[in-house]
Amino acid sequence: MNIEKVKTFLGGKSVLEMYNDLIMVGCTHDKSLTIIETITDKRLVRFVDLHFMDHPANFDNKKRIHAKGEINGKWYSVVGGPNLGGDGINTFEVLTEKLEGPIPHISKEEVEKIIIDLY
């Protein structure tokens, strides 16, 4: 499939809709994000782009981390560590202003899927 056909297939859709359509036709997570970046000419926030810092709740010497940011004026927060809805290594908890509550114990890929809904 050439890029013009892909643009026609995905044209006028939100980033999340594009992602879901690409997954539905068999693209991998990373390939879907790369295609969306090419079509929209936007650099999407990937998990590796998150800047984790010590979480303010580090009162008991157990490592807790958090990252936060904004996309198009919409905020997101990702946390991990003891008692924070993820181990901070493989699983994390994410909250965005579009969600009604935090989503705990999700993978790095799932964090990216939630964050792209802010575009």
Regions found by a protein language model. Name each.
Residues 41, 95-119:
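Mixed-charge, Lys/Arg-enriched low-complexity segments
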